[in-house]
C-alpha cells in the first residue's frame, strides 16, 4: 500500500530555513540531495511473475525504507532479474518501466514518468543564488532534476516528479514568507543643505551642493531702510 506523504508544515519549513541560515553563517558544507540509504551488497530478488507495485513495496520492506508508490505505476515483472546492488535494481526497474523516483530523506517516492511536472516559478524578492543554496542545504536538490534560472534571475524553470516539485514550491514559499517578515528600513529624505560663501566683496549661495545665487557688494538687494541687505549662513 502507498505510504501517506509527510507534509511540511510552515513551522517545519521555518525551522529548516533557520538551520540553513546557521549553516551559511558557520560555513558548513553539505552533500547535495538526500542520500538514499541503500547497502552496497547485492540485492537477491527472485520473481517470475509479480505486480510491479508489489515488487517495489517489497523492495522497501526488505531494506526498511518507507516507499510511496503512485497509482500510475503499473505493469508486471516477468522473467529473471540479474543479481544487482539495491540501487542498480531500483534504477533497472525505473528504466524498464519508465518510472521516476525521488527520496526526500524520509520516504522513497516512485511515480510514472508521465506524471513529471514542469513549473515556472516567480522568485519576487528572493535571489536565485539564495533559493538554490536553500535547496542544497535542505537536501532537496537532485542533479537528475535541474533547476534553471531565466535571464535576470526573476524566473526559475523546474521539472521533475511530483514530490520534488512540491518541495521546490514549499521552499520558495518559505523564503518569501521569511523575506516578508523582515522589517523594512524606511527611507528618510535627506535634508537640503544651504551655505553662504563670502569671498571679499562677493557672496555665493550654495544650495544642495550647487551654486545658486552670486552677489557682489554692488548687487546686494536693498532693505526697507535703503541699505544693503546682509546674508547669513542658514
Swiss-Prot record:
GO terms for cellular component: membrane. The keyword Transmembrane helix applies. Pfam families: Secretin_N. Keywords: Membrane, Nodulation, Plasmid, Transmembrane, Transmembrane helix. It is a single-pass membrane protein. InterPro entries: NolW-like (IPR005644), NolW-like_sf (IPR038591). The chain crosses the membrane at residues 17-36. Its main location: membrane. It comes from the Bacteria. The keyword Signal does not apply. It is found in: Membrane. Regulates cultivar-specific nodulation of soybean. This is Nodulation protein NolW. It comes from Rhizobium fredii (Sinorhizobium fredii). The lineage of its organism: Bacteria, Pseudomonadati, Pseudomonadota, Alphaproteobacteria, Hyphomicrobiales.
Amino acid at each position: 500500500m502507498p505510504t501517506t506523504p509527510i507534509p511540511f508544515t510552515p513551522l517545519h519549513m521555518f525551522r529548516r530555513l533557520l538551520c540553513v541560515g546557521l549553516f551559511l553563517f558557520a560555513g558548513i558544507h553539505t552533500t547535495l540531495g538526500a542520500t538514499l540509504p541503500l547497502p552496497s551488497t547485492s540485492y537477491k530478488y527472485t520473481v517470475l511473475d509479480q505486480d510491479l507495485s508489489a515488487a517495489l513495496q517489497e523492495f522497501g520492506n526488505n531494506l526498511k525504507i518507507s516507499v510511496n508508490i503512485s497509482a500510475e505505476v503499473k505493469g508486471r515483472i516477468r522473467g529473471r532479474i540479474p543479481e544487482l546492488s539495491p540501487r542498480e535494481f531500483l534504477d533497472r526497474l525505473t528504466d524498464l518501466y519508465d518510472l521516476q523516483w525521488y527520496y526526500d530523506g524520509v520516504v522513497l517516492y516512485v511515480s510514472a514518468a508521465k506524471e513529471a511536472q514542469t513549473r515556472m516559478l516567480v522568485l519576487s524578492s528572493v535571489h536565485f543564488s539564495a533559493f538554490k543554496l536553500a535547496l542544497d542545504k535542505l537536501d532537496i536538490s537532485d542533479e537528475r532534476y535541474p533547476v534553471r534560472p531565466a535571464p535576470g534571475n526573476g524566473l526559475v524553470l523546474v521539472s521533475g516528479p511530483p514530490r520534488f516539485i512540491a518541495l521546490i514550491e514549499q521552499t520558495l514559499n518559505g523564503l518569501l514568507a521569511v523575506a516578508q517578515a523582515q522589517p523594512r528600513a524606511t527611507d528618510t529624505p535627506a535634508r537640503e543643505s544651504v551655505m553662504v560663501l563670502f569671498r571679499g566683496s562677493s557672496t555665493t549661495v550654495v544650495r544642495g551642493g550647487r551654486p545658486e545665487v552670486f552677489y557682489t557688494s554692488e548687487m546686494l538687494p536693498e532693505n526697507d531702510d535703503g541699505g544693503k541687505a546682509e546674508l547669513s549662513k542658514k
